[in-house]
Amino acid sequence: MPAPCCSSYRKGFTVPISPSIFKAYDIRGIVPSTLNESVALKLGRAFGQQALAAGEMVVAVGRDGRLSGDELSRALIQGLVDAGIEVIDIGRVTTPMLYFAANTLCHSGIQITGSHNPKDYNGFKMVLAGRAIYGDEIQKLRQIMEKEAWRMQGGGKVRQADVTQAYVERIVGDVKLARPMKIVVDSGNGIAGATAPGIFRALGCEVTELFSEVDGNFPNHHPDPSKPENLKDLIEALQSGDAELGLAFDGDGDRLGIVTKDGQNIFPDRQMMLFAQDVLSRVPGGEIVYDVKCSQRLAPAIEAAGGKPVMFKTGHSLIKARMRETNAPLGGEMSGHIFFKERWFGFDDGTYAGCRLLEILSRAQNPSAVLNALPTSYSTPELNVACEEGEPHKLTAELQAMAPSVFSEPAQINTIDGLRVDWPDGFGLIRASNTTPVLVLRFEGHTQAALHRIQNEMKALLLKVKPDAVVGSAAH
């Protein structure tokens, strides 16, 4: 079918594009001030040109449940068609379902999503020729968009496709539960609510649903399970009913939160211990990739299960790229992105990770006891230090240069992503965020005293390079 007429979008070409929307792993901004139909149209044309240059003729387009998704989708699709692309419009889906389409229907795709950002945000996550694009590739798109350096071509067209049935069948055909489980699922009014509860029921679970209605106003709580305040309703439902476990999803369904019957939040680095043990039972010696924010307890757990632990840079695109290089069967980030290559496609998917978790825990009579028994330490939540634009990377370079003269044995210095210093009883991390102008701090100690000592040592170093540093809780 032909694309809808978009003459109104063409009039927007005089509007300058805000450089702030081009992030390390995606394009993201506030609607309509920095992200609007004009930007979406230009992105469609620029991405379409890059796709054709890579030999990609077909691009899937999906969108989450945000209020601005429909208008941005229309403009993006028009831009892709202008570039000569065949667009497969898969409608309102989770980000992992867009990735699924880009693995099964074609090799490239764009998801319109604001992820876990406030409701007036939206953005674009992109896959080109089977790879999540990031960094320089996003900057190349920016250059094409700013210069309007595209060629309009004929031959573009749009068709609709529904991937839901194929996606559900693929998961239900892969995951088998040893027994039915009773769970509570909190989708936070994000797009996962449209599919995740039904998938869990298809696996044999008894599901109590919280906030499954897709509503871009997010009227109940923000869809970000990495923040404890967003898990209160889930914990209350668990403790007032007879469910065994609670699962929570972020706004676009690519991250998973887990809560035990007694209200304990099982953070992603501890989830990875369980997933690694399971995956390595079938892929002995496999490389398990995780980011620098993860617990010091994770590497020994991977080694004990017969795997090779590999610490890498934070960023879902970076973790996926590293996994592809080494054929790693599993990867994970402290932010909640879990990447299964074993039995799956290697992309981050909160629903699929939840299903794999249930498969493991269905073998136990007391799932909460299994989760609570995973090794843990005393740790801080993610902390932020606000900086000027461009300052965080400069500061981390200074910290990396100073560290060898400040920290001595038995401290081990790691500079793969900022500065991480490991002691026998804990670690400290200071790194530059790739998405906002802040330093990201995280500390862990085997005891409260160790945590306190490590925090003080790392903060003392930070104050040498940024005397006005104010450490606060992370905000998204």
Predicted regions, residues:
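N-terminal small/polar loop signature for handling phosphorylated ligands or for N-terminal nucleophile
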Residues: 53, 58-121, 169-170, 199-259
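Proline/glycine-rich low-complexity loops and linkers
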Residues: 90, 140-169, 173, 261-334, ...
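Phosphate-binding and adjacent anionic-ligand microenvironments
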Residues: 283-442, 447-476
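Cysteine-centered motifs
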Residues: 5-6
